[in-house]
Amino acid sequence: MRYSMVILSLLLILACKKGEVKSMVNDSTTNTVVNPLNYLALGDSYTIGESVERYENFPNQLANDLTKKGLIINSPIIVARTGWTTSELKSGIKDSGVPEHKFDIVTLLIGVNNQYRGESKDVYRKEFKELLQIAINFTKDKKSHVFVISIPDWGATPHGQQSGRDPQVIAKEIDAFNVINKEETLAAGLNYSNITPFSRLALSDKTLVAGDGLHPSGKMYAGWVANVAPLVLTNLK
C-alpha cells in the first residue's frame, strides 16, 4: 500500500508539471522556458479597428510585431467599442469582468469621442486620470508596462473634410485633448506615444484611411506600431 501511494504521488507530480509546460513556450536558443505575455488593449474604434480586418487592427499588429522582435505574446484581449468616450470605456471595463493584475502590457487610446461630442475637457482630464490608474492596476502596478497613444486627427480624413465641421477647428480641439492626456500620462510616470502627426498624413495619402473614409487603414495602424513597439521592447526586455 505504501509503495502504491508513492507511485501515485509521483504520477500526480508528473501530470501537474506536464500541465504547467503547456502554458509555457520552450526557447530552443537558450534552452529556457518562457511565459507568454498577456496584452490588454483599452479604447474605442481606433482600438478595435473599425472597418479593417481583425488582424489589421492596432493591437494585433502590435502583438505580431513584438513577436517578430523576440517577445512571445498571447492573442490580445480588447475592451473597446466604436463611439466610446472615457466614461463609457470605464463602464465597459467594469462590465467586461477582465481580472486585474493579470497583464504584462496595457495600451490605452481614448478621447476622440469626447472631442466629437463637445464634452468638457475638465471631465475628460478627471476620467482619463481614472483610466490611467485602472490601466496600472491591470499591469500588477508596473507603470512601465502601460502605453498611452495620442488621439488621431479624424479631421484629416475624407469624412472629416466633408463633415461640415472646420478641419482646423477639429485639429485644435484634438490637440487640446492630447495636451491633457500627455500631461496626465507623464505625470503618472507612464509611456506616451504621439501618433497624431502621422494620422494627419491622411490628408495627402488616402491609403492611410479605411474604406469608410473615416477610420485608419491597416497601413495607418502599422505606422502607429512602428512608433509604439520600440517603447514596449525597451520597457519589457
Regions found by a protein language model. Give the residues of each.
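A generic secondary-structure micro-motif detector
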Residues: 2, 52, 170-171
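Short acidic active-site motifs
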Residues: 88
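C-terminal motif of bacterial Sec signal peptides marking the signal peptidase cleavage site
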Residues: 12-15
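Bacterial signal peptide processing site
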Residues: 17-19
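Serine-esterase "nucleophile elbow" of acetyl-processing enzymes
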Residues: 22-82, 94-101
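Sec-dependent signal peptide recognition
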Residues: 2-8
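Alpha-helical cap/lid subdomain in secreted, periplasmic
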Residues: 91-237
